[in-house]
């Protein structure tokens, strides 16, 4: 590129209005944006009007180079990632955090990429008292100070806490309970014995590590609509009010201890359910000796990673779901000898949408025949495949789209996880990617 071409390009950018320049700068690393003040005199102060910043901070470097934080005028969104710590780093971290917090920001995302305990980010006490406008808070590998008697987070709606160190377990309970606008809470584990909130709509436990919750989970959340428990070994769960919960996600939950019947009671209140095949197995086992609750409200059911033998358990579970309209199944393996003679009432009379996720076409031939032949009101059957290997798979899919259906309104769709491995034929439709 010639000097003249560079000059023309520079002039074009320089003619853009400040508002558009801010949009461009907002998508660049913050340090690079600050450097633009050296390129053009007019840009010297534009970056100070940006509503957000995204910084990766190495604690071994000089913190003085970040003194530009004080010059932002309209700061609303801040993301800080610490990748290393140096001498006197903890004090400097608190100073930077205080500089950010005094801007009365609305969105704060702070974390450390370091795994050592002593490399956690130190959050200053001002997080409790000087964030009156804060709406979103995400902390990862951070140390939270002891909460004061008075905590002021009146606008906080979304809070995500991962690998946090509280001084006292009661601090977590207090932090949640004193946020009058809190709607969504996500944590990697229970940092206290209770979640109490009059405004909470969604609660997720996302821990990917196995282990027992040593304390019971107590939920005092009268407006809760969505509950997700992921890979938790739960000894006891107590929910004081079940009437508000609409969606329940128990994917990857393998053991409930003494609470299975309580969980089944919870399931009986929800309309949208995601469960692991372990729960299906337990339900089948207990159904032989106990009278278990029915799930008349359940409209949407998703079961992931179904293993050999879980089909029979699913059929028994479906017998208790007389009004089910949508069923999603993911198979990690398949048993050609499973029983297809039993047909639950919901398959016959209420099921409208079926989605099957599998590795190969051949595994699913009997399964799609089962739903096509028995479902009278089926509107859509979706088959999601990892791949299609050869011509035999194409022929088998052709049979799927021409297979007789008991419901004349049924649409058939095939989705492929990998692109370019399957070309749709004229007789049917195909959607790529899922």
From Swiss-Prot:
UniProt keyword Repeat, yes or no: yes
Region forming the signal peptide: none
Keywords attached to this entry: Leucine-rich repeat, Repeat
UniProt repeat feature LRR, residue ranges: 72-99, 114-141, 164-189, 204-231, 252-277, 306-331
Gene3D superfamilies registered for this protein in UniProt: 1.20.1280.50, Ribonuclease Inhibitor (3.80.10.10)
Domain F-box: 10-66
Top-level taxonomic group: Eukaryota
Protein name: Putative F-box/FBD/LRR-repeat protein At1g16940
Species the sequence originates in: Arabidopsis thaliana
């Amino acid at each position: 590129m010639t000097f003249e071409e560079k000059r023309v390009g520079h002039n074009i950018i320089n003619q853009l209005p400040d508002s558009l320049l801010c949009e461009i700068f907002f998508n660049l690393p913050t340090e690079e944006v600050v450097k633009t003040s050296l390129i053009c005199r007019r840009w010297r102060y534009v970056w100070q009007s940006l509503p957000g910043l995204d910084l990766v901070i190495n604690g071994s470097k000089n913190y003085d180079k970040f003194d530009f934080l004080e010059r932002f005028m309209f700061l609303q969104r801040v993301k800080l990632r610490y990748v290393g710590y140096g001498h006197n780093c903890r004090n400097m971290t608190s100073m930077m955090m205080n500089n950010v917090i005094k801007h009365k920001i609305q969105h704060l995302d702070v974390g450390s990429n370091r795994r050592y305990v002593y490399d956690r980010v130190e959050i200053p006490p001002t997080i409790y008292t000087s964030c009156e406008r804060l709406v979103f808070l995400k902390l990862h590998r951070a140390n939270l100070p002891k909460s004061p008697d008075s905590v002021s987070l009146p606008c906080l709606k979304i809070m995500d806490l991962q690998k946090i160190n509280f001084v006292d377990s009661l601090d977590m309970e207090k932090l949640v309970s004193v946020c009058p606008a809190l709607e969504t809470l996500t944590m990697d584990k229970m940092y206290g014995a209770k979640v109490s909130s009059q405004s909470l709509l969604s609660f997720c436990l996302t821990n990917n590590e196995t282990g027992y919750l040593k304390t019971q989970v107590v939920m005092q959340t009268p407006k809760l609509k969505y509950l997700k428990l992921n890979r938790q070994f739960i000894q006891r769960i107590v929910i004081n009010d079940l009437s508000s919960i609409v969606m329940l996600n128990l994917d990857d939950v393998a053991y409930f201890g003494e609470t299975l019947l309580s969980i089944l009671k919870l399931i009986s209140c929800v309309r949208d359910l995601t469960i692991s095949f372990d729960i299906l197995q337990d339900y089948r086992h207990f159904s032989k000796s106990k009278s278990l609750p029915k799930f008349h409200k359940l409209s949407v059911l998703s079961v992931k990673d179904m293993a050999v033998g879980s089909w029979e358990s699913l059929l028994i579970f479906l017998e208790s779901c007389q009004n089910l309209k949508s069923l999603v199944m993911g198979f990690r393996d398949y048993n050609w000898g499973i029983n297809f003679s039993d047909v639950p009432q919901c398959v016959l009379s209420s099921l409208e949408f079926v989605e099957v996720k599998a590795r190969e076409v051949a595994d699913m031939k009997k399964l799609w025949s089962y739903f096509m032949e028995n479902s009278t009101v089926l509107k859509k059957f979706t088959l999601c495949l990892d791949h299609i290997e050869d011509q035999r798979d194409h022929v088998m899919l052709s049979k799927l789209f021409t297979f007789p259906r008991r419901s004349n309104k049924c649409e058939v769709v095939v989705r492929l996880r990998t692109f370019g491995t399957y070309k749709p034929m004229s007789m049917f439709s195909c959607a790529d990617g899922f």
